[in-house]
């Protein structure tokens, strides 16, 4: 069971939190779900060049959006585009928008995936990429990186993965992060999956 289900979904009520929080009636659930997906798509499209760790969307009488970034320099890049972005978002729900930036310096699974994808696009060796990223994250209890597809242009798709430490997929109480993404190369699409076993007090 633990190996089939998404590790974040498996631990949602135990030690993880929802990144979408809506204060509304049950009949408006479908409408707010569509708005939530649309807002996240606009955020990704506008801030494509920035590595956002998390996106929190809180809908009440106002719309509150918390963007978690890892570097203060990233905020300086997007500072000039914030007015246009807030205007686009306010037209969707017709609510006042509160935009908060949270500087999150703790490395998470999405940051690792972002680094792996950048190195793949730079045409580095797959085994070298995995080895370097695992060595960077050896302070955690465990880290597993898997890359699948036509690796380095081979004719038959395969998986390349490596693990340092341990990844307890079946134990719900542990703080386990998971992230998956895809990247387009000249040989096709490569899938990247990251499992990260962190200390319980880290977010």
UniProtKB/Swiss-Prot annotation:
GO terms for cellular component: cytosolic small ribosomal subunit. Pfam families: Ribosomal_S3_C. Signal peptide: none annotated. The keyword Transferase does not apply. GO terms for molecular function: mRNA binding; structural constituent of ribosome. One of its GO terms (biological process) is translation. Disulfide bonds: none annotated. Keywords: Ribonucleoprotein, Ribosomal protein. Transmembrane segments: none annotated. Binds the lower part of the 30S subunit head. Binds mRNA in the 70S ribosome, positioning it for translation. Part of the 30S ribosomal subunit. Forms a tight complex with proteins S10 and S14. NCBIfam families: rpsC_bact (TIGR01009). Belongs to the universal ribosomal protein uS3 family. This is Small ribosomal subunit protein uS3.
């Amino acid at each position: 069971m633990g190996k089939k289900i998404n590790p974040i979904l498996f631990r949602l009520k135990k030690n993880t939190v929802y990144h979408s929080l809506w204060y509304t009636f049950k009949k408006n659930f479908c409408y707010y779900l569509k708005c939530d997906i649309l807002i996240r798509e606009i955020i990704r499209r506008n801030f494509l060049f920035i590595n956002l760790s998390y996106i929190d969307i809180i809908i009440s009488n106002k719309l509150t959006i918390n963007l978690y970034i890892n570097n203060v320099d990233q905020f300086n890049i997007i500072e000039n585009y914030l007015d246009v972005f807030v205007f686009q978002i306010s037209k969707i729900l017709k609510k006042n928008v509160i935009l908060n930036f949270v500087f999150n310096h703790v490395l998470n699974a999405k940051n690792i995936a972002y680094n792996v994808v950048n190195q793949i696009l730079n045409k580095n060796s797959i085994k070298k990429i995995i080895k370097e990223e695992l060595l960077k994250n050896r302070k955690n209890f465990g880290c597993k990186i898997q890359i699948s597809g036509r690796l380095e242009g081979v004719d038959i798709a395969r998986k390349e993965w490596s693990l340092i430490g341990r990844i307890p997929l079946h134990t719900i109480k542990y703080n386990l992060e998971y992230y998956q993404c895809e990247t387009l190369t000249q040989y096709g699409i490569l899938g990247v999956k990251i499992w990260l076993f962190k200390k319980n007090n880290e977010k």
